């Protein structure tokens, strides 16, 4: 609770700068319940909801949050929030979903704490997309200290033809105790793991002069430091690996570098920690009230797929978004094709572990998995695209992605018939091959679909209710049919 106390103090703190008179408190109270058949709830009733929804067929939660917004003089601003939640059949009975303070000057922000952040820096339709390949909204927020320019900032002298945005963050994974409880006998888990991410994205174009924009950039993230344990038959654990946690490790995370003699051999010939990322590209075309956007989200692990070392890129997510002029029927349409099947090929050979010391083959990337940190996950949910089901779905207590070689098609469509009503439909079809090291017994297929309607009554300002129907059919996660109802109340507490 120390973090929440710190946030409360920030509410009461008086900045050195002279203040404006206006300030605003906003509250949010929300409750949600899910009931379904099958072993698991339908995927799209769970995924991309910041870890708030459980994979279990019957679950629910209640959350309450308060935000404070304070504009100051000379372009300064403070935003802070505290969001608490409790649930039934969740990974925790009670948890702090958000506790943060943002200090902003013009377009530059220093954010401290745990905060729900949409995928960055590549923008996608958050209501319709299947997710982001490297990091998205599929898991609970990771507490961090983060400097960022969230929106594109024009570079002086370019007449607004060139702009950039980006971020730099260090944080800590808070799911160590969850991993220990979830982990099965003889399985491995990690605690006290640190987090690092950074991004830089450019936009070329000025839509006021030419109706075309091109975006390109890079996102990188790393798990580093921490300790690895193995669960024993008597319920105790033994430490297997003690990763370094000094200042040098923070530098190695920022600038991917081979580890020293205090790291396992695998880190000494590759890079220290679990380094991953994505190349991001976007192409926008504007025609009157129409907008067409194409995106490419290319995922990589270490260096093998970062460039064209093993041929042209075969893995990633290709997307097309179409935004229609305002009408009563359809607002947006989306299609995405996703592939993680190649993974740089099946061969991983580190010469120091074999007979040919001068031979190095860096294939078999084993996406989202790692031999020290187990998996790119937080509280059991994958940090990347949720069509690759996270460790929370593993009934044997293993913290890994059992199928990270997949091909999928995903579609979405949404509409806003009026100010009171909105709806969306999303559907995915995926084929799973398992892992190179442990392939599935056969190619397994899975369909995941969801229809959701939200009502925002004008006669009850601040209230909304959402009803969703989810349907899963297949032989990977199995069959499931279920519904979810979410009731929400938001409002202000004065200025």
Labelled PLM ranges:
Residues 1-24, 493-495:
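Bacterial Sec-dependent N-terminal signal peptides
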């Amino acid at each position: 609770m120390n973090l929440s106390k710190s946030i409360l103090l920030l509410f009461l703190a008086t900045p050195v700068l002279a203040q404006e008179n206006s300030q605003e408190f906003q509250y949010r109270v929300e409750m949600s319940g899910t009931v379904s058949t099958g072993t698991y709830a339908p995927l799209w009733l769970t995924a991309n909801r910041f870890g708030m929804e459980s994979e279990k067929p019957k679950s629910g939660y209640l959350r309450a949050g308060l935000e404070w917004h304070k504009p100051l003089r000379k372009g300064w601003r403070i935003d802070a929030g505290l969001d608490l939640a409790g649930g039934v059949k969740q990974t925790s009975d009670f948890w702090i979903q958000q506790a943060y303070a943002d200090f902003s000057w013009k377009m530059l922000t220093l954010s401290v704490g745990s905060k729900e952040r949409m995928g960055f820096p590549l923008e996608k339709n958050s209501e319709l997309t299947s997710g982001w390949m490297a990091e998205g909204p599929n898991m609970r927020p990771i507490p961090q200290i983060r400097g960022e320019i969230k929106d594109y900032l024009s570079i002086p002298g370019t007449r607004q033809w060139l702009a950039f945005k980006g971020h730099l963050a260090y944080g800590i994974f808070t799911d160590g105790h969850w991993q220990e409880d979830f982990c099965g006998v003889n399985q491995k888990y990690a605690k006290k793991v640190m987090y690092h991410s950074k991004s830089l994205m450019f936009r070329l174009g000025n839509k006021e002069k030419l109706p075309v924009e091109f975006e390109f950039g890079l996102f990188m993230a790393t798990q580093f430091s921490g300790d690895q344990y193995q669960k024993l038959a008597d319920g105790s654990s033994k430490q297997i690996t003690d990763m370094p946690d000094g200042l040098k490790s923070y530098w190695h995370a920022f600038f991917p570098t081979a580890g020293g003699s205090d790291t396992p051999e695998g880190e000494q010939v590759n890079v220290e920690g679990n380094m991953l990322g994505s190349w991001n590209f976007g192409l926008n075309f504007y025609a009157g009230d129409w907008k067409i956007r194409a995106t490419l989200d290319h995922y990589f692990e270490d260096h093998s797929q970062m460039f064209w070392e093993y041929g042209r890129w075969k893995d990633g997510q290709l997307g097309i978004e179409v935004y229609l002029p305002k009408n009563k029927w359809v607002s947006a349409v989306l299609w995405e094709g996703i592939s993680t099947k190649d993974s740089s090929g099946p061969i991983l050979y580190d010469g120091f572990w074999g007979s040919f010391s001068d031979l190095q083959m860096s294939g078999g990337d084993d996406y989202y998995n790692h031999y020290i940190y187990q998996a790119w996950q937080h509280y059991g949910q994958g940090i990347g695209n949720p069509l690759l089901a996270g460790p929370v779905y593993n009934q044997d207590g293993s913290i890994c992605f059992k199928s990270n070689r997949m091909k999928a098609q995903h579609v979405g469509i949404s509409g806003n018939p009026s100010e009171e009503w909105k709806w969306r439909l999303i559907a995915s079809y995926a084929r799973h091959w398992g892992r190179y090291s442990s392939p599935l017994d056969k190619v397994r297929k899975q369909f995941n679909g969801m229809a959701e309607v939200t009502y925002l009554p004008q006669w009850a300002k601040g209230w909304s209710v959402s009803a969703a129907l989810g349907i899963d059919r297949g032989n990977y996660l199995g069959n499931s049919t279920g519904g979810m109802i979410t009731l929400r109340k938001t409002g202000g507490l004065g200025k």
